[in-house]
Amino acid sequence: MKKSLVIFCFTLFSLNCFAQNDLPNVNLQSIDGKSVALKDVTNKEGVTIISLWATWCVPCLKELDAINDVYEDWQEETNVELIAISIDDSRTLRRVKSMVNGKDWDYTILLDTNTDLKRALNASSVPLTILVKDNKIVYEHSGYSPGAELELYKKIKELSK
């Protein structure tokens, strides 16, 4: 009985890890306030990194800074694109534009002001990093620790073949 339960749990976990879900087609806002459909800005030629973050989330900022240090190389090698989507609410939304300008990130920055994407992804915490290929979610990771960007890059290279 115990062995059957372990096998069942492993199978369930494996299916969950490898299941490909469609990227939700939600409307977000650009930093300039324009409405943007998420599916219209994902990379049609390869892999897109979608990073859900917030100005108050220290691990989010560390992750985006770490990726920024190597992003140009990643783009040259794999044609990957990154879309950083802020989940800041009305109380902290004002900080997004000035923070992005101060960080000098070379990413597409969008705002999930109504938390439509966060809800559609069932995201309970940030940072949440998702890899998308052909409008399918092919990888998800939540949280950040130094060096996690290297594991992310390995996944990007695998998907870019």
PLM regions and their residue ranges:
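A short beta-strand-turn-helix
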Residues: N27-V47
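Short, internal strand/loop/helix patches
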Residues: M99-V132
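Boundary of Sec targeting at the N-terminus
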Residues: A19-N21, K34
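Structural microenvironment flanking redox-active thiols in thiol-disulfide oxidoreductases
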Residues: K62-G102, N114-L117
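Hydrophobic beta-strand anchors of alpha/beta hydrolase catalytic cores
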Residues: I49-I50, L82, T129
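Short pre-active-site segment immediately N-terminal to redox-active cysteine/selenocysteine motifs
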Residues: E45-T48, W53-W56, S125
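Sec-dependent N-terminal signal peptides
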Residues: S4-L15
